[in-house]
Every structure is written in C-alpha cells, then in structure tokens.
Amino acid sequence: NKRTVEALIKAGAFDRLHLDRATLLASIDLAFDYALAQEANTHQVGLFDLTDDGHGSSTQEPALAEATPWDLRERLQQEKAALGFHLSGHLFDACANEVRRFVQTPLAHLEESREPQLLAGIVCDLRIINGNRGKLALFRLDDGSATVEASADESVFSGNTALKEDALLVAQGRVQFDRFSGALRLNAQNIIDLPTARHRFGKHLLVQIGPLAASEPGPSFSRVFSDHPPQRTTTDSGDVLMRGLPVRVRLGIRSNDGSIVEGTLALNEDCQFYPSDAALASWTALLPQGQVHVVYSGS
C-alpha cells in the first residue's frame, strides 16, 4: 500500500536505510514498479536467465529518484502530517539562530512587565472566539524553552496572515500574571511573521563571493531580484512604500601572485528584494556554502 509506505517515510521509519526522506518519497513509484516486476519474474526462468548457480537472475535495481532534500521545518511538518505531532525536533529550531538575533529573550526567561516586550515562538492551539468586543484570537507561543498563553484582539489579527498554526510569530505586547491560570499571559498588540521581521529588524543581506580569479565571472543575481521584488504597500494617506532589503556583496579577488584582495560593495537601491523564505532559498541555491545571511542591528 503506497499510502502506508508514504506515511512511514514521513515518520522516519526508513531513516536507517536512507536518511534523505524526500528522495525516498520521490522513489516510491520506482520501488513499487520494481517489486511488481520482480514478483512477475519469480517463476519465469528462461534459458538465458540462468546464472552459474542455476537461479534466475534479477533485473537491476533502479536508482533512487532525485529530489530536493527537506529542510528541518519541512521534515517536522511531514512528521506531523503522518503522526499528528513533531517527533525529531521542535519547529522553533528551524529558525532559532536567526530569531535570536532580534528577539534575545527565551520564553523561559519571560517576566511580568508593564512595558511592551518583543517575543517569538511557534503558534500552537490557535482558536478564534467571539468576545464582548468582537472576535478574539487565543493561542500559545512555544519556543522550545517554554510556552506562554497569548491573546490578540480582532484589530490586531484581522487581515494579518502572520497568525497561523505551526507558524513562527513575532509578537509585541504586555506580559502580565493571569490569576486564573496562575501563569504569565501575553496580550499581543502587534504581530508579524518572519519575513516581515527580517525587513523590519534586518540591516541588509550580506552575500560573500570568492575568492575568484581576476578573470573569473561571478554569479548573476538578476533572477533573484526579478522573482522576489520588494513589496509595495500603500499608507492611509496614499503614499506608496517599498518593503525590501538592501544587498551588500563581500567580494574576494585572487591575483596572479596568489594574494587576495577583499572589499564590500553596497548595491544600489534598485537591487532590493523582499526577504521571504523562498527568496533566501534562491540566494542559498546560488551560493550554497553558507555565504548568504541577513545582518541584523547589533550583529
């Protein structure tokens, strides 16, 4: 049953055979076709099928299909689709290193304060209820260190796509002690997703190239800029704002004598992009050796 095998692959049951679950999932049809062919040939031994030991020779096993490996987030989401929960890690781990550059406080170290605080975590148990003042979103934020109950008024989440189950949410609001639950509770006043946080807190994207030979061409970025342009937003007064992240290139050139000269170039304002996950994946595909990252204030 292909569906059963698919679920087992997503859950990691075949990890000891092959660690790349995406490749295994893409190879299911090949595996079943090969198994059916083997079964059909089991009792059909011809004159030219006999080997030295008298047994029927099998057809050659097909190579595994090619597939893009899953990142941590995709792997955990596939586990939840198969099992109903994340088995091999926490969703926050997929973005923890980046998020901690602009949200330093783990939820385990959260303290009550009248001043608004900036928090980040994965949205869990999201539900919308009808309150006395309109709709109210109730959810939990979980960053792997702890969880905190949270709420957001309709004016905060209405028309905002950031509030989704299993999504990374950056929330600003007041944290107060809830006598009913006996724990801290967040009243979110502003919520954004990770791409918006990159634009808001990031200074620029740093792209490291080289060292290259003096005559060696560098990679072309034009496709990334055309596929992921800055987002246009219109203010209440009619002004058009561009939401994009600038790019800086750190370039190394190797001269004929072997010495290396390095310099950093700031691309012009036309060379900006919206820092979505897909955009960063495109940058990483161009420079896969960890040569691309968002630079945040203070880093």
Q: Each predicted region: which residue ranges?
A:
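Catalytic cores of large soluble enzymes that bind and process phosphate-bearing ligands
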Residues: 68-71, 75, 87, 161, ...
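Single-stranded nucleic-acid-binding OB-fold domains
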Residues: 18-19, 87-201, 211-223, 229-243, ...
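A residue-level signal for conserved active-site and pocket-lining positions in enzyme catalytic cores
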Residues: 47, 79, 83, 121, ...
